[in-house]
Amino acid sequence: MVTRLTLRIGVVVAGLAVVGTTAQAQRRVRGGRAVLVDRPGVGPRVGYDFNFDHAFVGGQLNLPVGRRWTLVPSAEFYPGATGSPFRLNADLKFHPPTVYGFFYVGGGFAYLHQSGASDAGANLFAGWEGRRARPFKPFIEGKFVFADNTSFNVEAGLNFPL
């Protein structure tokens, strides 16, 4: 059963995806100076779900929609767990204006599925993303998933520019 909140979150995420498809990952001019916008990226992730008490693997796609904003759709699978559980996420990540831009916060929509049952909810997360000068960017984050059961996850992974 889809609640009104879930439907609203889905509409917002779909709208952001439409806006994000026209964004170009290149230098933009702001006030007479060039501003670097990250390129889209893709990468693997691993983590641990403390509520489910199980490790998971997955991947994500990073789609910059602005100088500090990134749309991050991702999928996480729980190998070896009963019922073949998985989670699909559509998150929006924000890098606040800090000295090096390592820290980020965000939130979004979560769809959870296990043994024929599904649930929709929301994510809130904060994390650290490595230096942008390398050919890849490592990250680590803590994520709260608010659905039928609230869970806390610790995740880590790499992002490779496309």
For the regions a language model picked out, list residue spans one by one.
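Cleavable N-terminal export/targeting peptides
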Residues: M1-V35
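Small side chains
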Residues: G10, G15, G20, G106, ...
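Short glycine/proline- and aromatic-enriched beta-strand/turn motifs that initiate or cap beta-hairpins
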Residues: Q24-R67, L71, F77, F94, ...
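Transmembrane beta-barrel outer-membrane domains
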Residues: V35-R39, F50-H54, A81-R87, S115-G121, ...
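Short glycine/serine/threonine-biased micro-segments
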Residues: G41, R45, Y104-G106, F125, ...
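Gram-negative (and chloroplast) outer-membrane scaffold detector with strong preference
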Residues: G58-P138
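C-terminal binding/interaction regions
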Residues: E141-V145
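Outer-membrane beta-barrel "beta-signal"
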Residues: T150-L162
